[in-house]
């Protein structure tokens, strides 16, 4: 999408240089704003994470004293307040973005409708307006039979574009909904302009004037129809009474040729009255039929209005549910991201601690090994020095005399010496071991 956008604008940059510069500047501002917001969110999350880690470290070696418990409670409240503040800020940002998205969608829809109306041309627009106006026709028979207020109301609808005042049904429905919410106060017009981006404030004011006149004429029409129905019912009752009187009068027979001209004239008058009563009855029936048709049309319009209101409420409920679901999913996603980041940070911290411990253990073993090797080398050197000194002490130059092997040793000579008696008493005999044969005579 970005590639297509840049290729399109680069191809036509000479034709739309000013517009492209404006769009490029706006895009750069939005990019910088997103980066700043991302950095701010990361900073807040990092601060919350550091506070959580600090609390975890405090909980490792803790003594259950009142001061320590109070300190831990304050830390937990601080972390909870920070998390709640972060959630509230994000919720407000999401609501603002959703409102901007709705406004943008409404603007796009309004622009699309305008473009479609431009594409259709003036002839199609006139046909559509005539189709709207044709929903409330006023024929000559109706003008002669219906009350003046009803005819005036129908003419008003025909001249102003139907029951929506020339607006489309959705715009008029939103207008009525906002107006009813504010109970007709003038402050509702600004909100209508926000909900209907395709309409200006002047158009909304003109539509409000039309709608006030529409309500006034409609109320007069209802009152007039009610009065008209009452009068017609009274006339109908009078005609029925007259008809009953006429029916009770016997019709003239052909066998009575001797009746006087005065009686025949009176009979003709009665017949004429009966015919006029029948014509009035037919006229009343036709008027009642037209009134019934009007009632049916009004009831149909009310049903359609109620159905549109119901659909609008359902749409609002669906949008509200969708919004809540989206916010909940976004909150869960952020919470999951924070949890994953915390777990990753904890794993990195644990891995770093384990790595440092292993390195320290290996370094200690290496030091012990080096010390042991040095001790062995020193011991070996010391032993070598002692041997050297010992060799220096006992070393003597002796001439070689192989015959000394056959000579008796000094010890042997001392043993073989004959020692005479030293006293007058007898000498004890001291036994000696036998001399080996190979030593005898030496």
UniProtKB/Swiss-Prot annotation:
Keywords: Coiled coil, Cytoplasm, Cytoskeleton. It comes from the Eukaryota. The keyword Cytoplasm applies. Residues 245-272, 289-312, 392-442 are annotated as: Disordered. The keyword Cytoplasm applies. It is found in: Cytoplasm, Cytoskeleton, Microtubule organizing center, Centrosome, Centriolar satellite. Residues 23-116, 217-249, 281-400 form a coiled coil. Its main location: cytoplasm. Residues 256-268, 294-310 have a biased composition (Basic and acidic residues). InterPro entries: CCDC148/CCDC112. Signal peptide: none annotated. GO terms for cellular component: centriolar satellite; cytoplasm. This is Coiled-coil domain-containing protein 112. The lineage of its organism: Eukaryota, Metazoa, Chordata, Craniata, Vertebrata.
